[in-house]
């Protein structure tokens, strides 16, 4: 009887390496696949693709599996990076890792794996898949400190049915122990951080390569001019560092935070104090939705939601907001809910799916002009 073939997405990191070893130990016919999703465009100071590939080959040799490299740079540029630039140009703060998972790692990669005769794919993500009553559920990892279901919430039934997450029930500390015990050459390699195609290079420098600077006024909620910004695309809601007002003695003396953007007038609004009302929201509208089960929760469903990675689930109530949109009403005010980021819903351990945040209502008089999503929020009330 032939072994079931599983293709493992291998990045050169510890997690995907241990994933491949675990599946080999369980008797699968394991093939490693290294994805190159970005063409290096500098001297290698920030990009680690070459070293990552060397690590993948070394691990594959040690555990005794075949490995190949595939270039998805063109697909990544068309499906992920182009959207990344569009969102930043519109003044929002996108999360390309969410789109990369849906469009590249679990679409382009999945299709390629199937062409290699795989029955399933596996990655080193910290999450779980459970089949129940003929449906597939996306669950949080047992190690909640490493849970990555937030980034995977756009996966659908077809994708989950062919996906394995072997690390979903293993603490990260145990993964490191396994790597050391079996002698993986990358056992002590640091976890990757930041956006995959930016690496460790300064984010503003990278963005400036693709988006022009367009300076404009920086104002307080009452209209007082306190400085000049270099371009709305280079700032995000709740940002504290890099505003250029650290030494300002105006106002309360508290730190300054980015609070709003007015695209029409090219104005950046800033406030003082972490808990300023302009930074707190009890309601949001999200669009571009995706539901793991293929359909949204029931109207008025009480659930938990994350508006950023590693945030504790916030109690809220779900409502439809017209078209392919939904609104969330939170029990407690949420800090710096950022347009462009994902609002992801949970029913306990189960990730239901989510959407892209379009608008977060602070309910404060004199707020900067609201975007087009504001009427949808009013409609949902």
UniProtKB/Swiss-Prot annotation:
This is tRNA-specific 2-thiouridylase MnmA. The keyword Nucleotidyltransferase does not apply. Residues 95-97 are annotated as: Interaction with target base in tRNA. GO terms for molecular function: ATP binding; tRNA binding; tRNA-uridine 2-sulfurtransferase activity. Catalyzes the 2-thiolation of uridine at the wobble position (U34) of tRNA, leading to the formation of s(2)U34. GO terms for cellular component: cytoplasm. Residues 146-148, 308-309 are annotated as: Interaction with tRNA. It is found in: Cytoplasm. ATP binds at residues 9-16, 35, 124. One of its GO terms (biological process) is tRNA wobble position uridine thiolation. Keywords: ATP-binding, Cytoplasm, Disulfide bond, Nucleotide-binding, RNA-binding, Transferase, tRNA processing, tRNA-binding. The active site is at 100 (nucleophile), 196 (cysteine persulfide intermediate). NCBIfam families: PRK00143.1, trmU. Its EC number is 2.8.1.13. Pfam families: tRNA_Me_trans (PF03054), tRNA_Me_trans_C (PF20258), tRNA_Me_trans_M (PF20259). It catalyses: S-sulfanyl-L-cysteinyl-[protein] + uridine(34) in tRNA + AH2 + ATP = 2-thiouridine(34) in tRNA + L-cysteinyl-[protein] + A + AMP + diphosphate + H(+). Disulfide bonds join 100-196. Belongs to the MnmA/TRMU family.
């Amino acid at each position: 009887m032939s072994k079931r073939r599983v293709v493992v997405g291998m990045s050169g990191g510890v997690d995907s390496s241990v994933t491949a070893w675990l599946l080999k130990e369980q008797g699968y016919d394991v093939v490693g696949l290294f994805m190159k999703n970005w063409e290096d465009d500098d001297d290698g100071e920030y990009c680690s693709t070459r070293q990552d590939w060397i690590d993948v080959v070394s691990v594959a040799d040690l555990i005794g599996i075949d490995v190949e490299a595939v270039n998805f740079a063109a697909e990544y540029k068309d499906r992920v990076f182009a959207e990344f630039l569009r969102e930043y140009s519109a003044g929002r703060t996108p999360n390309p890792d969410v789109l990369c998972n849906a469009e590249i790692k679990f679409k382009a990669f999945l299709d390629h794996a199937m062409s290699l005769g795989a029955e399933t794919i596996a990655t080193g993500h910290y999450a779980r898949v459970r089949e129940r009553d003929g449906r597939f559920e996306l669950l949080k990892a047992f190690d909640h400190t490493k849970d990555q279901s937030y980034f995977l919430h756009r996966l659908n039934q077809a994708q989950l049915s062919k996906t394995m997450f072997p690390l979903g029930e293993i603490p990260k500390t145990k993964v490191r122990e396994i790597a050391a015990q079996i002698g993986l050459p990358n056992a002590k390699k640091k976890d990757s951080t930041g956006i995959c195609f930016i690496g460790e290079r300064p984010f503003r420098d990278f963005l400036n390569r693709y988006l022009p600077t367009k300076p404009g006024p920086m104002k307080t909620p009452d209209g007082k001019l306190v400085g000049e910004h270099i371009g709305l695309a280079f700032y995000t809601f709740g940002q504290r560092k890099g505003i250029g007002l650290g030494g300002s003695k105006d106002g309360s003396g508290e730190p300054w935070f980015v609070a709003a953007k007015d695209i029409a007038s090219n104005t950046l609004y800033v406030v003082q104090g972490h808990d300023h009302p302009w930074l707190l929201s009890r309601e949001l509208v999200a669009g571009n939705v995706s539901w793991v089960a293929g359909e949204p929760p029931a109207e008025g469903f009480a659930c938990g939601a994350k508006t950023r990675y590693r945030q504790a689930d916030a109690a809220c109530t779900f409502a439809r907001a017209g078209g392919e949109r939904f609104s969330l009403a939170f029990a407690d005010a949420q800090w710096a809910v950022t347009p462009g980021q994902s609002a992801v819903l949970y029913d306990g351990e189960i990730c239901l799916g989510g959407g892209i945040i379009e608008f977060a209502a602070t309910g404060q008089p004199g707020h900067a002009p609201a975007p087009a999503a504001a009427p949808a929020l009013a409609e949902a009330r």
